[in-house]
Amino acid sequence: MRDESGLLRVFMASKSDGYPVIYADAPLAIKNEAFGVSELIEINGKSDPYRVTAYRDEAGNLRIVQYAKFNKYWSLGSDSEIESSNPTEYVVFLIAGQSNAQGMGAAAKSPSVNPGIAYQYYGGNLTPVLGDPVGNASTGSAWPAFANEFYRRTGLGVVFIPAAIGSSGLAAIASLPANGGNGQNWSGTGTLRGTAIARYNDAISALESGGFAYRFGGVLWSQGERDARCLPSASNKITEQDYKNEFSNLKSYFSETFGEKFVWILSQTGGDDAGIDAQGLADMRRLQREIVRSTSGVYFGWNGAYNLIARGLMRSHDFPNDPDNVNRSHYSQQGYNEMGTAMAVVASAVAIGNS
Protein backbone atom coordinates (compact mmCIF):
# COMPACT_ATOMS: atom_id res chain seq x y z
CA MET A 1 0.00 0.00 0.00
CA ARG A 2 1.02 3.66 -0.32
CA ASP A 3 0.74 5.85 2.76
CA GLU A 4 -0.20 9.55 2.83
CA SER A 5 3.39 10.51 1.97
CA GLY A 6 3.36 8.34 -1.13
CA LEU A 7 5.74 5.76 0.30
CA LEU A 8 5.18 2.12 -0.60
CA ARG A 9 4.82 0.15 2.64
CA VAL A 10 4.39 -3.53 3.42
CA PHE A 11 1.49 -3.99 5.79
CA MET A 12 1.34 -7.78 6.03
CA ALA A 13 2.68 -11.01 4.66
CA SER A 14 1.22 -14.51 4.74
CA LYS A 15 3.01 -17.17 6.72
CA SER A 16 3.01 -20.80 5.68
CA ASP A 17 -0.13 -21.50 7.72
CA GLY A 18 -2.04 -18.85 5.82
CA TYR A 19 -2.51 -16.40 8.70
CA PRO A 20 -1.34 -12.82 8.28
CA VAL A 21 1.49 -11.00 9.93
CA ILE A 22 0.32 -7.49 10.74
CA TYR A 23 1.87 -4.40 12.23
CA ALA A 24 -1.14 -2.92 13.97
CA ASP A 25 -4.04 -4.32 15.92
CA ALA A 26 -7.24 -2.54 14.98
CA PRO A 27 -10.93 -3.41 14.78
CA LEU A 28 -13.04 -3.53 11.65
CA ALA A 29 -13.52 -0.08 10.12
CA ILE A 30 -16.98 1.26 9.53
CA LYS A 31 -18.06 1.70 5.90
CA ASN A 32 -19.81 5.02 6.34
CA GLU A 33 -19.12 8.54 5.08
CA ALA A 34 -19.95 9.85 8.54
CA PHE A 35 -16.67 8.31 9.65
CA GLY A 36 -14.64 9.96 6.91
CA VAL A 37 -14.89 7.10 4.41
CA SER A 38 -15.79 8.47 0.99
CA GLU A 39 -14.64 5.65 -1.28
CA LEU A 40 -14.43 1.89 -0.97
CA ILE A 41 -12.05 -0.18 -3.07
CA GLU A 42 -12.18 -3.97 -2.91
CA ILE A 43 -9.46 -6.11 -4.47
CA ASN A 44 -9.94 -9.87 -4.70
CA GLY A 45 -6.81 -11.73 -3.71
CA LYS A 46 -5.29 -14.54 -5.71
CA SER A 47 -6.54 -17.14 -3.27
CA ASP A 48 -10.21 -16.80 -2.39
CA PRO A 49 -11.60 -16.04 0.23
CA TYR A 50 -8.79 -13.56 0.87
CA ARG A 51 -9.90 -9.97 0.35
CA VAL A 52 -8.13 -6.66 0.71
CA THR A 53 -10.21 -3.55 1.27
CA ALA A 54 -8.91 0.01 1.05
CA TYR A 55 -10.73 3.17 2.10
CA ARG A 56 -10.05 6.70 0.94
CA ASP A 57 -10.90 9.49 3.37
CA GLU A 58 -12.45 12.89 2.64
CA ALA A 59 -9.02 14.39 1.94
CA GLY A 60 -8.26 11.69 -0.60
CA ASN A 61 -5.77 9.86 1.61
CA LEU A 62 -5.63 6.08 1.68
CA ARG A 63 -6.44 5.51 5.33
CA ILE A 64 -7.27 1.89 6.04
CA VAL A 65 -6.33 -1.43 4.57
CA GLN A 66 -8.29 -4.42 5.72
CA TYR A 67 -7.58 -8.10 5.25
CA ALA A 68 -10.34 -10.67 5.66
CA LYS A 69 -10.05 -14.45 5.85
CA PHE A 70 -12.80 -16.86 6.89
CA ASN A 71 -14.71 -14.06 8.63
CA LYS A 72 -11.71 -13.06 10.73
CA TYR A 73 -10.71 -9.45 10.26
CA TRP A 74 -7.50 -7.51 10.67
CA SER A 75 -7.26 -3.85 9.79
CA LEU A 76 -4.81 -0.99 10.17
CA GLY A 77 -4.40 2.65 9.29
CA SER A 78 -1.68 3.74 6.92
CA ASP A 79 0.01 5.51 9.83
CA SER A 80 -0.33 2.38 12.02
CA GLU A 81 -2.77 4.11 14.36
CA ILE A 82 -5.80 2.18 15.55
CA GLU A 83 -8.89 2.78 13.45
CA SER A 84 -12.12 2.29 15.37
CA SER A 85 -15.68 1.67 14.27
CA ASN A 86 -19.15 1.20 15.61
CA PRO A 87 -20.33 -2.40 15.93
CA THR A 88 -23.39 -3.36 13.94
CA GLU A 89 -24.66 -5.77 16.60
CA TYR A 90 -24.72 -5.67 20.40
CA VAL A 91 -24.75 -8.35 23.09
CA VAL A 92 -26.72 -7.59 26.25
CA PHE A 93 -25.35 -8.56 29.68
CA LEU A 94 -27.09 -8.25 33.05
CA ILE A 95 -24.61 -7.36 35.81
CA ALA A 96 -25.72 -8.88 39.12
CA GLY A 97 -24.32 -9.66 42.55
CA GLN A 98 -22.79 -7.41 45.17
CA SER A 99 -20.14 -4.70 45.45
CA ASN A 100 -17.39 -6.29 43.35
CA ALA A 101 -19.92 -6.56 40.53
CA GLN A 102 -20.61 -2.85 40.98
CA GLY A 103 -16.94 -1.96 41.25
CA MET A 104 -15.08 -0.22 44.07
CA GLY A 105 -11.89 0.69 42.21
CA ALA A 106 -10.19 3.87 41.04
CA ALA A 107 -12.05 5.18 38.01
CA ALA A 108 -9.01 7.18 36.88
CA LYS A 109 -7.13 3.90 36.36
CA SER A 110 -9.98 2.29 34.42
CA PRO A 111 -9.59 2.14 30.63
CA SER A 112 -11.53 4.41 28.33
CA VAL A 113 -13.95 2.92 25.80
CA ASN A 114 -14.27 4.23 22.26
CA PRO A 115 -17.69 5.70 21.38
CA GLY A 116 -20.19 3.19 20.06
CA ILE A 117 -18.59 0.08 21.55
CA ALA A 118 -20.64 -0.06 24.77
CA TYR A 119 -23.89 1.22 26.24
CA GLN A 120 -25.63 0.84 29.58
CA TYR A 121 -29.25 0.95 30.58
CA TYR A 122 -29.48 2.60 33.96
CA GLY A 123 -31.69 5.19 35.60
CA GLY A 124 -34.27 4.76 32.86
CA ASN A 125 -31.89 5.76 30.08
CA LEU A 126 -29.74 4.05 27.47
CA THR A 127 -26.42 5.90 27.47
CA PRO A 128 -22.94 5.34 25.99
CA VAL A 129 -20.24 3.83 28.19
CA LEU A 130 -17.00 5.73 27.58
CA GLY A 131 -15.37 4.54 30.78
CA ASP A 132 -16.23 4.43 34.46
CA PRO A 133 -18.41 4.84 36.38
CA VAL A 134 -20.88 2.23 35.14
CA GLY A 135 -24.32 1.97 36.72
CA ASN A 136 -24.71 2.73 40.39
CA ALA A 137 -20.99 2.57 41.13
CA SER A 138 -19.31 5.91 41.78
CA THR A 139 -15.88 4.37 41.36
CA GLY A 140 -13.99 2.09 38.97
CA SER A 141 -15.38 -1.26 37.81
CA ALA A 142 -14.54 -4.29 35.67
CA TRP A 143 -16.85 -3.32 32.83
CA PRO A 144 -14.89 -0.89 30.62
CA ALA A 145 -12.13 -3.51 30.38
CA PHE A 146 -14.80 -6.13 29.63
CA ALA A 147 -16.27 -4.02 26.82
CA ASN A 148 -12.87 -3.43 25.20
CA GLU A 149 -11.82 -7.08 25.31
CA PHE A 150 -15.18 -8.39 24.14
CA TYR A 151 -15.15 -6.02 21.18
CA ARG A 152 -11.53 -6.82 20.37
CA ARG A 153 -12.32 -10.53 20.18
CA THR A 154 -15.71 -10.44 18.47
CA GLY A 155 -16.26 -7.09 16.78
CA LEU A 156 -19.56 -6.99 18.69
CA GLY A 157 -20.65 -4.22 21.02
CA VAL A 158 -22.04 -4.69 24.51
CA VAL A 159 -25.00 -3.30 26.42
CA PHE A 160 -24.71 -3.51 30.19
CA ILE A 161 -27.70 -3.63 32.51
CA PRO A 162 -26.21 -2.87 35.95
CA ALA A 163 -28.28 -4.41 38.75
CA ALA A 164 -25.70 -5.31 41.41
CA ILE A 165 -26.09 -4.01 44.95
CA GLY A 166 -23.26 -3.82 47.46
CA SER A 167 -23.43 -6.15 50.48
CA SER A 168 -26.43 -8.00 49.05
CA GLY A 169 -26.89 -11.63 49.98
CA LEU A 170 -28.09 -14.53 47.91
CA ALA A 171 -29.83 -16.08 50.91
CA ALA A 172 -32.28 -13.86 52.77
CA ILE A 173 -30.80 -14.79 56.15
CA ALA A 174 -27.35 -13.68 55.02
CA SER A 175 -28.69 -10.24 54.18
CA LEU A 176 -30.20 -9.54 57.60
CA PRO A 177 -28.67 -6.54 59.40
CA ALA A 178 -28.24 -8.72 62.47
CA ASN A 179 -25.92 -10.90 60.37
CA GLY A 180 -23.99 -7.99 58.89
CA GLY A 181 -26.12 -7.44 55.78
CA ASN A 182 -28.13 -4.50 54.53
CA GLY A 183 -31.46 -6.29 54.12
CA GLN A 184 -31.17 -6.62 50.34
CA ASN A 185 -30.94 -10.04 48.74
CA TRP A 186 -31.48 -12.10 45.59
CA SER A 187 -33.77 -14.70 47.18
CA GLY A 188 -37.43 -15.21 46.41
CA THR A 189 -38.38 -13.00 49.35
CA GLY A 190 -36.07 -10.17 48.29
CA THR A 191 -36.63 -7.41 45.75
CA LEU A 192 -33.40 -7.51 43.73
CA ARG A 193 -34.35 -10.27 41.29
CA GLY A 194 -37.60 -8.57 40.36
CA THR A 195 -35.87 -5.21 39.96
CA ALA A 196 -33.26 -6.80 37.67
CA ILE A 197 -35.86 -8.38 35.40
CA ALA A 198 -37.88 -5.15 35.23
CA ARG A 199 -34.73 -3.26 34.27
CA TYR A 200 -33.94 -5.88 31.63
CA ASN A 201 -37.40 -5.53 30.10
CA ASP A 202 -37.09 -1.74 30.03
CA ALA A 203 -33.63 -2.01 28.47
CA ILE A 204 -34.94 -4.26 25.69
CA SER A 205 -37.70 -1.75 24.96
CA ALA A 206 -35.10 1.01 24.73
CA LEU A 207 -32.95 -1.06 22.37
CA GLU A 208 -35.96 -1.80 20.19
CA SER A 209 -36.90 1.88 20.08
CA GLY A 210 -33.32 2.80 19.24
CA GLY A 211 -33.12 0.39 16.32
CA PHE A 212 -30.35 -1.72 17.83
CA ALA A 213 -29.57 -5.21 16.57
CA TYR A 214 -29.03 -7.18 19.76
CA ARG A 215 -29.07 -10.54 21.49
CA PHE A 216 -28.89 -11.56 25.14
CA GLY A 217 -25.46 -12.72 26.28
CA GLY A 218 -26.11 -13.77 29.87
CA VAL A 219 -25.56 -12.78 33.49
CA LEU A 220 -22.23 -11.45 34.76
CA TRP A 221 -22.28 -12.55 38.40
CA SER A 222 -19.93 -11.59 41.24
CA GLN A 223 -21.36 -12.48 44.63
CA GLY A 224 -20.50 -14.60 47.64
CA GLU A 225 -18.65 -12.53 50.23
CA ARG A 226 -21.83 -11.75 52.18
CA ASP A 227 -23.05 -15.37 52.31
CA ALA A 228 -19.54 -16.73 52.95
CA ARG A 229 -19.54 -14.94 56.30
CA CYS A 230 -22.71 -16.83 57.23
CA LEU A 231 -21.56 -20.36 56.34
CA PRO A 232 -21.03 -22.97 59.09
CA SER A 233 -17.27 -22.29 59.15
CA ALA A 234 -17.99 -18.60 59.83
CA SER A 235 -21.09 -17.47 61.77
CA ASN A 236 -23.18 -20.60 61.01
CA LYS A 237 -26.32 -18.78 59.87
CA ILE A 238 -26.83 -20.74 56.62
CA THR A 239 -25.76 -24.16 55.37
CA GLU A 240 -23.78 -24.84 52.22
CA GLN A 241 -26.85 -26.52 50.75
CA ASP A 242 -28.86 -23.36 51.47
CA TYR A 243 -26.53 -21.40 49.20
CA LYS A 244 -26.67 -23.99 46.43
CA ASN A 245 -30.46 -24.10 46.61
CA GLU A 246 -30.73 -20.31 46.45
CA PHE A 247 -28.46 -20.17 43.40
CA SER A 248 -30.52 -22.82 41.64
CA ASN A 249 -33.71 -20.98 42.52
CA LEU A 250 -32.41 -17.67 41.17
CA LYS A 251 -31.22 -19.29 37.97
CA SER A 252 -34.66 -20.85 37.47
CA TYR A 253 -36.32 -17.49 38.09
CA PHE A 254 -34.16 -15.76 35.49
CA SER A 255 -34.83 -18.62 33.06
CA GLU A 256 -38.49 -17.63 32.96
CA THR A 257 -37.40 -14.44 31.17
CA PHE A 258 -34.11 -15.34 29.50
CA GLY A 259 -34.87 -18.96 28.54
CA GLU A 260 -33.13 -22.14 29.59
CA LYS A 261 -30.05 -21.68 27.39
CA PHE A 262 -28.81 -18.37 28.82
CA VAL A 263 -25.45 -18.44 30.58
CA TRP A 264 -23.97 -17.25 33.85
CA ILE A 265 -20.37 -16.09 33.86
CA LEU A 266 -19.01 -16.05 37.40
CA SER A 267 -16.23 -14.12 39.03
CA GLN A 268 -15.07 -16.41 41.82
CA THR A 269 -15.03 -14.90 45.30
CA GLY A 270 -11.64 -13.76 46.56
CA GLY A 271 -10.24 -13.33 50.04
CA ASP A 272 -10.32 -10.81 52.86
CA ASP A 273 -7.36 -8.44 53.08
CA ALA A 274 -7.65 -8.46 56.87
CA GLY A 275 -7.88 -12.26 57.08
CA ILE A 276 -11.38 -12.23 58.57
CA ASP A 277 -13.63 -15.25 57.83
CA ALA A 278 -10.88 -16.79 55.69
CA GLN A 279 -12.31 -20.30 56.05
CA GLY A 280 -15.82 -19.17 55.13
CA LEU A 281 -14.48 -17.51 51.99
CA ALA A 282 -12.48 -20.64 51.12
CA ASP A 283 -15.64 -22.70 51.53
CA MET A 284 -17.51 -20.28 49.27
CA ARG A 285 -14.90 -20.72 46.54
CA ARG A 286 -15.31 -24.48 46.85
CA LEU A 287 -19.10 -24.15 46.65
CA GLN A 288 -18.77 -22.04 43.53
CA ARG A 289 -16.55 -24.69 41.93
CA GLU A 290 -19.16 -27.32 42.75
CA ILE A 291 -21.93 -25.17 41.25
CA VAL A 292 -19.97 -24.60 38.04
CA ARG A 293 -19.16 -28.30 37.71
CA SER A 294 -22.74 -29.43 38.23
CA THR A 295 -24.87 -26.70 36.62
CA SER A 296 -25.40 -26.44 32.89
CA GLY A 297 -24.77 -23.00 31.42
CA VAL A 298 -22.68 -21.74 34.37
CA TYR A 299 -19.05 -20.86 33.64
CA PHE A 300 -16.18 -19.38 35.56
CA GLY A 301 -15.06 -16.12 33.99
CA TRP A 302 -12.35 -15.20 36.48
CA ASN A 303 -10.64 -17.04 39.31
CA GLY A 304 -7.93 -14.49 40.00
CA ALA A 305 -9.48 -12.55 42.88
CA TYR A 306 -7.97 -14.80 45.55
CA ASN A 307 -4.41 -14.07 44.36
CA LEU A 308 -4.85 -10.29 44.55
CA ILE A 309 -3.94 -10.31 48.24
CA ALA A 310 -0.57 -11.94 47.62
CA ARG A 311 0.03 -9.59 44.69
CA GLY A 312 -0.76 -6.50 46.77
CA LEU A 313 -3.64 -5.58 44.49
CA MET A 314 -6.57 -5.30 46.85
CA ARG A 315 -8.34 -1.94 47.16
CA SER A 316 -5.82 -0.60 49.68
CA HIS A 317 -3.33 -0.47 46.79
CA ASP A 318 -5.29 2.46 45.32
CA PHE A 319 -6.84 3.81 48.52
CA PRO A 320 -4.31 3.26 51.33
CA ASN A 321 -6.02 5.77 53.62
CA ASP A 322 -9.55 4.39 53.35
CA PRO A 323 -11.03 2.43 56.28
CA ASP A 324 -10.22 -1.26 56.50
CA ASN A 325 -13.90 -2.25 56.38
CA VAL A 326 -14.16 -0.54 52.96
CA ASN A 327 -10.95 -2.00 51.53
CA ARG A 328 -10.85 -5.55 52.87
CA SER A 329 -12.96 -7.47 50.32
CA HIS A 330 -12.61 -5.16 47.35
CA TYR A 331 -10.08 -4.98 44.53
CA SER A 332 -7.67 -2.43 43.15
CA GLN A 333 -8.50 -1.05 39.73
CA GLN A 334 -5.90 -3.35 38.20
CA GLY A 335 -7.79 -6.23 39.78
CA TYR A 336 -11.08 -5.05 38.30
CA ASN A 337 -9.46 -4.58 34.89
CA GLU A 338 -8.16 -8.16 35.03
CA MET A 339 -11.59 -9.37 36.13
CA GLY A 340 -13.36 -7.67 33.23
CA THR A 341 -10.84 -8.80 30.65
CA ALA A 342 -10.94 -12.43 31.81
CA MET A 343 -14.74 -12.55 31.93
CA ALA A 344 -14.90 -11.09 28.43
CA VAL A 345 -12.69 -13.90 27.13
CA VAL A 346 -15.26 -16.45 28.30
CA ALA A 347 -18.22 -14.32 27.24
CA SER A 348 -16.78 -13.88 23.76
CA ALA A 349 -16.24 -17.63 23.37
CA VAL A 350 -19.89 -18.21 24.27
CA ALA A 351 -21.08 -15.40 21.99
CA ILE A 352 -19.39 -16.84 18.90
CA GLY A 353 -20.41 -20.41 19.68
CA ASN A 354 -17.20 -21.82 21.11
CA SER A 355 -18.55 -22.54 24.58
Protein language model annotation of sequence segments:
Residues 9, 21, 48, 63, ...:
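Short, isolated positions in well-ordered beta-strands
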Residues 50-51, 55-65:
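Right-handed beta-helix
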